[in-house]
Design a protein with these regions (language model features):
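Nucleotidyltransferase catalytic core that binds NTPs
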Residues: 2-210, 214, 222-225, 242
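Short interaction-hotspot residues at assembly and binding interfaces
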Residues: 218-244
Length: 244
């Protein structure tokens, strides 16, 4: 009888060891970006990576200056976070963690997250968010130099996803989303049906539009002599993947 008890005890110990040290570890997808603002194109990327990974981490970087504004209102990391929460809740997507990085660029934020001080458990497989469009995955060509040796980086060129397009067939663009919000147009195609006003409220645009309307009304009532306006030369912006 004692031999039977010994055998059972050994089996229990083996099972406990297996539970404590799972074979293969977890897979975590990291999707970095400034997200100014986040939109359904970003959400689709999260959805695709959620099918490949056990958990998706959306890493919001913190630019040194407010380079993206709408009607004078900067799109802060807090506002980006609120819009993300709305999008994820509407889509019913769980297993997504929203985190803010103090680093100014998405790439720097990612390297900081996966380095020797990474909060990820040893043995975790890492997917770095990237689009198949335009060789976007090449941004991670140096990632192997920064990743914690205890983590396993999956090849970005193999895990990159196909970017979604808007209903019109046009690619999603944060620039276009900002422009539509600035011009007080319906931007539901970027944020979901009936969500334009919610996004305006999060970004603090409602009060700005009301103030501009009041100022315009006052200008019409008062005397206004024609003023010559000098056109400002528009600065050319460097091209970058607006998916992020």
């Amino acid at each position: 009888m004692s031999k039977l008890y010994d055998s059972i005890e050994e089996l229990i110990i083996e099972l406990e060891d297996e539970d404590g040290d799972p074979v293969g570890g977890r897979t975590v997808a990291i999707i970095p970006g400034a997200f100014k603002p986040p939109h359904l194109g970003h959400l689709d990327m999260v959805r695709q990576y959620a099918e490949q990974a056990d958990e998706v981490i959306v890493l919001i970087s913190s630019p040194l200056r407010a380079s993206r504004v709408i009607l004078g209102q900067p799109i802060s990391t807090r506002k980006s976070m609120e819009i993300w929460e709305m999008l994820l809740d509407d889509a019913g997507i769980s297993d997504v963690k929203l985190e803010v990085s103090p680093k100014p660029s998405p790439v720097a934020a990612t390297y900081d997250y996966i380095d020797e001080n990474s909060p990820l458990e040893p043995g975790t497989k890492i997917i770095l968010g990237a689009s198949q469009k335009g060789g976007d995955f090449k941004r991670w060509r140096s990632a192997a130099k920064y990743v914690n040796p205890a983590l396993e980086l999956l090849p970005p060129e193999e895990t990159a996803v196909i970017p979604a397009n808007r209903p019109s067939g046009e690619p999603y663009s944060a620039t276009d989303a900002r422009k539509m919000l600035e011009q007080d147009e319906n931007a539901d195609e970027f944020f979901g049906e009936g969500r334009t006003e919610t996004v305006r409220s999060i970004l603090g645009l409602d009060s700005q539009i009301d103030e501009m309307s009041a100022m315009a009304g006052g200008a019409v009532q008062g005397y206004g002599a024609p003023l010559g306006t000098k056109k400002r030369k528009k600065k050319k912006q460097s091209e970058y993947n607006e998916l992020y």
